[in-house]
Amino acid sequence: GGRALLYYLIPYCAMSVGSFAVVAARERELNRPVTVENLAGFGWERPLLGGGMTVFMLGFAGFPLTGGFVGKFYLFAAAYDRGWIWLIIVGVVATAVSLYYYLGVIRAMYFRPSEELQLAPVAGGSPPRELVLQTAVTAAIAVTVGSFFAVQPLIDAARHATEFLFL
């Protein structure tokens, strides 16, 4: 259980940081808070940030090829090993409900037309900040997808961490 949780924290933290970086970049462009409505067309306007947000939403939902999938799989397997079928049912239902929201963000970014190009010039311009946000998103994408392919080393690290923490 602890090993699965520690593994899941790796992609979950990356997905959280990445999605917040995307929102921060969008708020900076619009000079107002981000809503699903003002994400319309964002995936086409800003392919890196829109693609990143797509990867993060799919990861949160537990789609394959993301660390979110592996993390949920290991968490559900740990619950099954302990006989906590009720927890698996709650997790599956929560995941199904969350799909509506996660896929809604993706739908808005790619399938709702932007009424106008919503990019606004940033007062004073700050390329370094933009570079930092894009770098954070790129790194978070790498961890989200990479944690799917590097499962064993991360599980081994989680095992060592749980042995250290609980012994």
Predicted feature locations:
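Alpha-helical transmembrane segments of multi-pass membrane proteins predominantly involved
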Residues: 1-167
